[in-house]
């Protein structure tokens, strides 16, 4: 078995973010380029509206993100967005060092996607770049980008950073969030929401508008706002206030015997199994002469036995369905 190392983990994550961002944006850019091909009507830019094209492009971005997050979640986290990575750094889910590796990978992946679409699909013009709509001031565009990014990032934090029984379908919620953001933002700002998405076409066509900075500052501020709200809710223990989505899962809970077996497996410490179903005393130790590990384990036992979510089996006759097989 190959030994894990931080360098190897960083390399795998970097490759995952580069390839994942490339695939996400390639299919999204290609859909936008296809929808905006001249056919007697104007391309869907912030200067003209066409709801059918708007829906097509918004759905393409949302579906492409959902599919690729699902694929790459276990490889790199499926971030594909510097704003998302920033938020994960703020909540301490990703280290700053790792972020400095992932963000350049995202920018490179996005740029390769933009170059691939430009090279593969006929036509000289890039029709998927972002720009402000008519009458939209820079500060207005900034706040639009801030709010759209806030929605996406907060969705990701609540569905992915919070581990629940619905985490496995989180990519659907993330895709819907981006879909909604594009429905709102395409006409007004081009719906950047992602610095890699805004930067890539501008780089390939070597054209950066004077207000390009809003596609970096807006998402960054949105990330700070989303991370701040998330941390605030966690500090206030929001899960104890409203209905608990995971109540059923917790009620199923663990029996004392299951909890005991888990602790024994993790700690590797033998003990005398008592018929009461409680976790008993440690072999070869006394209350006054337990090792630090024993004392720590004893604290865990007391917590588990006092936890109302852990069902205790019948005295001396544990239910066989409660025991691991």
Swiss-Prot record:
Pfam families: MIP (PF00230). Signal peptide: none annotated. Gene3D superfamilies: Glycerol uptake facilitator protein (1.20.1080.10). It comes from the Eukaryota. Residues 1-10, 74-100, 162-167, 234-325 are cytoplasmic. Induction: Expression is higher in vegetative hyphae than in conidia and infection structures. GO terms for cellular component: plasma membrane. Residues 279-298, 305-325 are annotated as: Disordered. Glycans are attached at residues 39, 47. A motif (NPA 2) lies at residues 194-196. A motif (NPA 1) lies at residues 81-83. Plasma membrane water channel that regulates the reactive oxygen species (ROS)-signaling pathway through its capacity to act as a membrane channel for hydrogen peroxide uptake. Required for the formation of infection structures and infection, especially on host leaves where it is essential for the penetration into the host. Regulates the expression of proteins related to redox-regulation and intracellular signal transduction and plays a role in the distribution of mitochondria in the hyphae. Aquaporins contain two tandem repeats each containing three membrane-spanning domains and a pore-forming loop with the signature motif Asn-Pro-Ala (NPA). This is Aquaporin-8.
């Amino acid at each position: 078995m190959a030994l894990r190392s931080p360098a190897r983990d960083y390399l795998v994550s970097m490759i995952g973010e580069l390839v994942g961002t490339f695939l996400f944006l390639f299919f999204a850019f290609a859909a936008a380029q296809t929808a905006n091909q001249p056919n007697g009507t104007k391309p869907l830019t912030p200067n003209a509206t066409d709801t059918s094209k708007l829906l097509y492009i918004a759905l393409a971005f949302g579906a492409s993100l959902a599919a690729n997050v699902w694929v790459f979640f276990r490889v790199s986290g499926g971030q594909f967005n510097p704003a998302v990575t920033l938020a994960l750094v703020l909540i301490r889910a990703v280290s700053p060092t790792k972020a400095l590796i992932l963000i350049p990978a995202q920018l490179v992946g996005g740029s390769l996607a933009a170059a691939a679409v430009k090279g593969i699909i006929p036509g000289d013009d890039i029709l998927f770049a972002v720009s402000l709509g008519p009458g939209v001031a820079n500060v207005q565009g900034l706040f639009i980008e801030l709010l759209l990014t806030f929605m996406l990032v907060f969705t990701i934090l609540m569905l992915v950073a919070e581990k629940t029984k619905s985490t496995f379908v989180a990519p659907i919620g993330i895709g819907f969030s981006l879909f909604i953001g594009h429905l709102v933002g395409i006409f007004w700002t081009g719906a950047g929401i992602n610095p890699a998405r805004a930067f890539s076409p501008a780089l390939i066509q070597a054209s950066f508008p004077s207000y390009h900075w809003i596609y970096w500052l807006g998402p960054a501020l949105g990330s700070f706002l989303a991370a701040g709200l998330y941390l605030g809710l966690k500090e206030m223990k929001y899960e104890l206030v409203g209905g608990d989505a995971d109540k059923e899962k917790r009620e199923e809970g663990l029996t004392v015997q299951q909890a005991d077996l888990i602790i024994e497996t993790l700690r590797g410490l033998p003990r005398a199994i008592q018929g009461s179903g409680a976790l008993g005393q440690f072999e070869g130790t006394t209350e006054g002469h337990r090792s630090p590990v024993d004392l720590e384990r004893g604290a865990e036992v007391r917590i588990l036995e006092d936890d109302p979510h852990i069902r205790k089996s019948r005295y001396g006759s544990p239910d066989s369905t409660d025991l691991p097989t």
